[in-house]
Amino acid sequence: VRGIVSVEIRLEQAGDEAAIYKVTTDAFRGRPYAGGDEQDLLNRLRELGQLALSLVAMDGDQLVGQITFSPVTLSDGSEPWFGLGPVSVTPEHQSQGIGSQLIRSGLDEISARGALGCVLTGNPAYYQRFGFELAPKNVPKEEPREFFQLKLLSATKAEGIFAFHSAFYDSHVR
């Protein structure tokens, strides 16, 4: 860790789209876990009205990070549940705590909105610090069991299988 940088976290605004696209592209380029279309996924979710929450990190007037939360469904019908991701920080600003600030701010916001919990597919060693735990009983069939995680934000238990929006799997969904 190079030291914690203080950034302003705010809601995505009209006009941020191009900078978010670039940050996301740059953040995932060449990463072994990247699908390669994270930036296009964000645009699909936005176009489909599935960005429940999009926060950006500003270093002065430069957009240096972004996090997305989208609605997910649980087969037991309980709601609302959210999926976290992608979360992106420009390569030159990584390892400075910006991703952590985005994640904590986003979790606080969806919790304030009444979220029952949040799921994601990601590195357990990274996300456990935010209270995420592996959720093998709830994993969607499309997701790897060893990376699917859940953080409860209420007393409600997750009974059933989660599903991300089809935009996560089909680049032609519009």
Model-derived segments and their meaning:
Residues 89, 95-108, 120:
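Conserved acetyl-CoA-binding loop-helix of GNAT-fold acetyltransferases
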Residues 7-20:
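A short beta-loop-alpha structural element at the N-terminal edge
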Residues 21, 27-73:
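Active-site rim helix/loop that mediates acceptor-substrate recognition in acyltransferases
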Residues 1-5:
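Short, Lys/Arg-enriched N-terminal segments with co-localized hydrophobic residues
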